[in-house]
Swiss-Prot record:
Pfam families: Ribosomal_L18p. It comes from Chlorobaculum tepidum (strain ATCC 49652 / DSM 12025 / NBRC 103806 / TLS). Coiled coil: none annotated. Keywords: Ribonucleoprotein, Ribosomal protein, RNA-binding, rRNA-binding. One of its GO terms (molecular function) is 5S rRNA binding. This is Large ribosomal subunit protein uL18. Gene3D superfamilies: 3.30.420.100.
Length: 119
């Protein structure tokens, strides 16, 4: 399967899931994006169209993270969960953004659950 086909397939899956998954102020959407070397997570309120908070492996505060990409993803999950709990958000809707729930996506979700997010 070529890269174009994989990207188009992921976009179709993303569109189908976004028709169902909606974030609110009380229960925002935890949206995950995975590139070849980095991972990004955002808490999004779809009602107002605003990003409430974000964490990524590219940010300055995470410049010292070392280990495998899965270990870094788990650390990003814990970090976004700690930020959310500090703002009083304990429940989220997980949006895997068309990616398979496997590897780094699963590691991020497990890290967020360990830190106290419920989804």
């Amino acid at each position: 399967m070529s890269q174009v086909d994989k990207t188009a397939r992921r976009q179709k899956i993303k569109a189908r899931s976004r028709a169902v998954v909606r974030g609110t102020q009380e229960r925002p959407r935890l949206c995950v994006f995975r590139s070849l070397s980095q991972i990004y997570a955002q808490l999004i309120d779809d009602e107002s169209g605003k990003t409430l908070m974000a964490a990524s492996s590219m940010s300055k505060e995470n410049a010292g993270l070392t280990g495998t990409k899965s270990e870094v993803s788990a650390a990003i999950g814990k970090q976004i969960a700690e930020k959310a709990l500090a703002q009083g958000i304990s429940r989220v809707v997980f949006d895997r953004n068309g990616f398979r729930y496997h590897g780094r996506i699963k590691a991020l979700a497990d890290g967020a659950r360990e830190a106290g997010l419920i989804f």
